[in-house]
Design a protein with these regions (language model features):
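Mg2+-dependent phosphoryl-transfer enzymes with acidic/Ser/Thr/Gly-rich catalytic loops
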Residues: 2-6, 17, 23-24, 178-259
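Active-site neighborhood of HAD-like aspartate-dependent phosphohydrolases
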Residues: 2-7, 11-57, 259-286
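Active-site metal-binding loops of divalent metal-dependent hydrolases
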Residues: 13, 68, 209-210
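Active-site phosphate-binding/coordination module
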Residues: 19-121
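Short active-site oxyanion
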Residues: 37-41, 60-61, 144-146, 202-203, ...
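Substrate-recognition/cap helix-loop segment adjacent to the acidic, metal-dependent catalytic center
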Residues: 46-64, 150-168, 286
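A structural signal for hydrophobic residues in beta-strands of small regulatory alpha/beta folds
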Residues: 64, 79, 240-241, 270
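Conserved acidic, metal-coordinating active-site core of Asp-based
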Residues: 94, 98-207, 211-219, 228
Length: 286
């Protein structure tokens, strides 16, 4: 039997509503979970800098950022998967070769988020942290992640082929593609977290909605897709709950809290040890 020790949340489209806020109901339920001994974690493709407002609000025990390239516990780095200055320049040059000199690019570093934006991103999303404008001409920094806006799937495929040593995932809500080290995925970051913190992956409940979340949901003891998730995520998750605008996470955790005796069996089913029977109830937070 396995109990839940860590609740792990993607941000955009999952923990965040469409207006890029966390609902008071969700915050209240998460506080209750923490009081009962659950660890709280964030697993996001945002850079740490662009998630700062939510990090301050949630105070997560575990932070996975830049799509898995960074893992922090408190102020301690547990895992980093960085590109060298030379590798970063090669990636930028490849993006411009395939997509043109005017293509929009973002780069995450440990300390900042760089973007050759055409429109200030904070005018579109006020939750977005500070982005430093650069034309990338003389960019010389180590990096965690590159994102490129690519409107043509053929060109996206060409860039993926040129950067075959990278992990590439598209974000479903636009035309952006993320490139990280092959070893920098959310699921790899979870395994690194487990190794350091003494947690087993089957003791984690993870929530997500997009392509980058699929591996994470499949790895953890229970992978939960939001009602607004893309179909590929719903099809690979253990269960689907309400949407991010319907307090889906809060409703799930509230119901889970009603079944105090339910535990995860090793195969992901739920068993009620008090009654000695397998339950059809879909919620568990022992």
């Amino acid at each position: 039997m396995k109990t839940c020790r860590l609740l792990l949340f993607d941000l955009d489209g999952t923990l965040l509503r469409s207006d890029k806020t966390i609902s008071p109901r969700t915050l209240s339920v998460l506080r209750s979970c923490r009081e009962k001994g659950r660890l709280l974690g964030v697993s996001t493709s945002r850079s740490e800098q662009n998630a700062l407002s939510f990090i301050r609000e949630l105070q997560p025990d575990i932070l996975i950022a830049s799509g898995g390239a960074l893992v922090k516990r408190g102020g301690e780095y547990l895992y980093l998967a960085e590109f060298s200055e030379e590798e970063t320049k090669r990636m930028i040059d490849a993006a411009r070769q395939v997509c043109g000199d005017e293509c929009e690019i973002t780069i995450d570093t440990l300390d900042a988020h760089y973007w050759n934006y055409k429109t200030d991103p904070r005018k579109q999303d006020r939750s977005w942290g500070d982005s430093i404008y650069t034309d990338f001409e003389d960019f010389r920094e180590r990096s965690l992640k590159m994102c490129v806006e690519i409107f043509d799937e053929k060109r996206a495929g060409q860039l993926q082929a040129m950067l075959a040593d990278c992990d590439c995932v598209r974000f479903s809500d636009g035309y952006w593609y993320k490139f990280t080290k092959k070893t920098a995925t959310k699921e790899r970051a979870i395994l690194e977290t487990c190794a350091v913190c003494g947690i087993k992956s089957e003791e984690i409940i993870a929530f997500g909605d997009d392509y980058a979340d699929i591996g994470m949901l499949e790895l953890c003891g229970r992978g939960i897709a939001m009602g607004n998730a893309i179909e590929e995520v719903k099809n690979r998750a253990d269960m689907v709950i309400g949407s991010n605008d319907e307090d889906g996470i809060a409703v799930y955790l509230e119901k889970a809290g009603q079944f105090q005796y339910l535990l995860f069996d090793l195969d992901g089913t739920l068993t009620d040890p008090k009654l000695g029977i397998t339950s059809c109830v879909q919620y568990a937070l022992a």
